[in-house]
Amino acid sequence: MAAEFNNDWDDLLKDEFEKEYYLNLRKFLINEYKTQKIHPSMYDIFNALKFTPYKDVKVVILGQDPYHGPNQAHGFSFSVKPGVQTPPSLRNMFKELNSDLGCYIPNNGFLESWAKQGILLLNTVLTVREGQANSHKGKGWEIFTDRVIELLNKREEPIVFILWGRNAISKEALITNSIHKIIKSVHPSPLSATRGFFGSKPFSKTNDFLVSINKEPIDWQIPNI
């Protein structure tokens, strides 16, 4: 579980894999994958970092931990595999995208095309037991993903950080470089979306910022499959 990303994250994160917290996390995960049903597949844990190299990151959308239902999680925050029903929070994201930018609501929740455009779809915890939300909280992943955020904060090219909900907003303390843009609101979950997520226009705000720094805006439209 010391990963190879096959991009610039390899050099940036290589020291993390030697640290005591990560070695303990690795031991824990080896046992969990042997004895429990864990999501995502161990081959998908680091997909966010594999698909979106450090130098290419334009936007970060922080999630909490992976979906814990069968066949949902595949290493990207909020995204589900093709053929899997779109979860409620992602449905609300698509509703906001529709009202914000006029994107049609797709028949799937597969967000890989966002990752390929420079959106780092990063959960703060990268694994979970099936049916047990937050079951891998406090095992070491937070230290690892905080390091990812710290490295992004150091970058000299601006990044948009999208922080939805208390867990994500708590990471704002790591984003100290004033060149970056922070967009935050309540979570798109049905429990909170009507209290400030709907109407917050995060997608057009992101594109407006990217255009202002002479970057290509994101094509947010997820195509039907």
Swiss-Prot record:
It is found in: Cytoplasm. Its main location: cytoplasm. PROSITE patterns: U_DNA_GLYCOSYLASE. It catalyses: Hydrolyzes single-stranded DNA or mismatched double-stranded DNA and polynucleotides, releasing free uracil. One of its GO terms (molecular function) is uracil DNA N-glycosylase activity. Pfam families: UDG. GO terms for cellular component: cytoplasm. It is an enzyme of class 3 (hydrolase). InterPro entries: UDG_fam1, Ura-DNA_Glyclase_AS, Uracil-DNA_glycosylase-like, Uracil-DNA_glycosylase-like_sf. GO terms for biological process: base-excision repair, AP site formation via deaminated base removal. Keywords: Cytoplasm, DNA damage, DNA repair, Hydrolase. Excises uracil residues from the DNA which can arise as a result of misincorporation of dUMP residues by DNA polymerase or due to deamination of cytosine. HAMAP family: UDG. PANTHER family: URACIL-DNA GLYCOSYLASE. Belongs to the uracil-DNA glycosylase (UDG) superfamily. UNG family. This is Uracil-DNA glycosylase. It comes from Clostridium perfringens (strain ATCC 13124 / DSM 756 / JCM 1290 / NCIMB 6125 / NCTC 8237 / Type A).
